[in-house]
A protein has these predicted regions:
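Structured alpha-helical
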Residues: 1-98
């Protein structure tokens, strides 16, 4: 699966927007390649365009790792509706159904 990611980070009084793609998704986080670099430990706002979701999923996430432009994120404070969408998408990926 190819997921579009949009990330916003607030630094030095300015909001910076990055975008990218991912093919790694779990119930607790996502990995992807972005158009710029983030630092490990930064908290970002992100939007994920997922199948089974009528609108992009808006989440807060913590940067857990970075290798070049490749980043790993851990989702923070997920509500029940967001958790349900993530679970359904992950189940769909595990079974190979659409």
């Amino acid at each position: 699966m190819d997921i579009r990611i949009s990330v916003q980070i607030f630094r030095s009084g300015e909001t910076t927007s990055l975008w990218g793609r991912s093919n790694e998704l779990g119930e607790d986080g996502v990995g992807g390649t972005l158009t710029g670099e983030l630092e490990v430990g930064e908290v970002v706002s992100m939007e994920l365009s997922l199948p089974l979701a009528a609108y992009p999923l808006k989440l807060r996430a913590l940067v857990r790792y970075r290798i070049g432009l490749r980043h790993g994120f851990e989702f923070l404070a997920i509500n029940e509706q967001q958790r349900d969408v993530l679970q359904r998408v992950c189940e769909m990926l595990a079974t190979g159904t659409k």
